[in-house]
C-alpha cells in the first residue's frame, strides 16, 4: 500500500490551517497579546510539610510516624502507610546538614527541628538510652552467670537455681507448643485423607 498520498494530504491540511490561525491571532486585542506575552510565574507555591524532626532512617516507621505531623496514616494488613498527601518539593540542604557536626549526634534516632521541644528530644534520645540499658542488663546477666558462687554465698546459689528453673520451664513450654503443632498437622493430614477416601467412595 502506498502511504505517500495519505501523508501528502495530511501535510496539506495541516499547512492550510496554519495561516488561518495566524489571521485569527492578529485579530486578538492588545490586552490579550499582553496576557499571552507575560511569562508564567516561575515557581508555584507548594505547601510545606510540618515536620517535628527528621529521622536518621526512613525504615524506622515509628520515628517517621512521630516526626511527620500532617500525614494521614492508614492501617493496612501488612504495615502502616502514609495516605493522601503527595510529597512536596524538598528544600535544598546545605552541606552542614548533610555532614554531621558532632559525632555524638550520629547515634541518635532523629534530630529535632526545635531544640526546646522536650517531647521530641526525649523520643530521639530514648532509643539510644534503651539500647545502652539493654546491653548493660545483658552484660550484668552474663557476668552473674560466669561468676563463681562460693564468694557470694546462698544468694548466688538461689539465683542460679531460679534462673535454671526458668530456663527449664521455657524449654518445656516451647516443647509443648512444638508438640501441639505436630499433633494439629497430623490431624489435618488425617482429615484430608479421610475426606479424599470419602469423596472417592461417592
UniProtKB/Swiss-Prot annotation:
Which residues are tagged with the site Cleavage?
A: 73-74
Keyword Lipid metabolism tagged: no
| Disulfide-bonded cysteines | 53-67, 55-63
Q: Tell me where it mainly resides.
A: secreted
- Could you tell me which InterPro entries the record lists for this protein? Endothelin (IPR020475), Endothelin_toxin_CS (IPR019764), Endothln-like_toxin (IPR001928)
Under SMART domains, the record lists: END (SM00272)
Q: Where is this region: Endothelin-like?
A: 110-124
- Disordered: annotated span: 28-47
Q: Does the keyword Translocase apply?
A: no
| Biological process per Gene Ontology, one example term | cell-cell signaling
Positions annotated as pro-peptide in this chain are 26-50, 74-202
| Signal peptide from the UniProt entry | 1-25
Intracellular or extracellular location(s): Secreted
Q: Which UniProt keywords apply?
A: Cleavage on pair of basic residues, Disulfide bond, Secreted, Signal, Vasoactive, Vasoconstrictor
Query: What Gene Ontology terms describe what this protein does at the molecular function level?
Result: cytokine activity; endothelin A receptor binding; endothelin B receptor binding; hormone activity; receptor ligand activity; signaling receptor binding
Give the record's GO CC terms: basal part of cell; cytoplasm; extracellular space; rough endoplasmic reticulum lumen; Weibel-Palade body
On the tree of life, the source organism's domain of life is Eukaryota
The role this protein plays is:
Endothelins are endothelium-derived vasoconstrictor peptides. Probable ligand for G-protein coupled receptors EDNRA and EDNRB which activates PTK2B, BCAR1, BCAR3 and, GTPases RAP1 and RHOA cascade in glomerular mesangial cells. Also binds the DEAR/FBXW7-AS1 receptor. Promotes mesenteric arterial wall remodeling via activation of ROCK signaling and subsequent colocalization of NFATC3 with F-actin filaments. NFATC3 then translocates to the nucleus where it subsequently promotes the transcription of the smooth muscle hypertrophy and differentiation marker ACTA2.
Q: Which protein family is it in? A: Belongs to the endothelin/sarafotoxin family.
Q: Report what the protein is called.
A: Endothelin-1
Organism, per UniProt? Rattus norvegicus (Rat)
**Which gene does this sequence derive from?**
Edn1
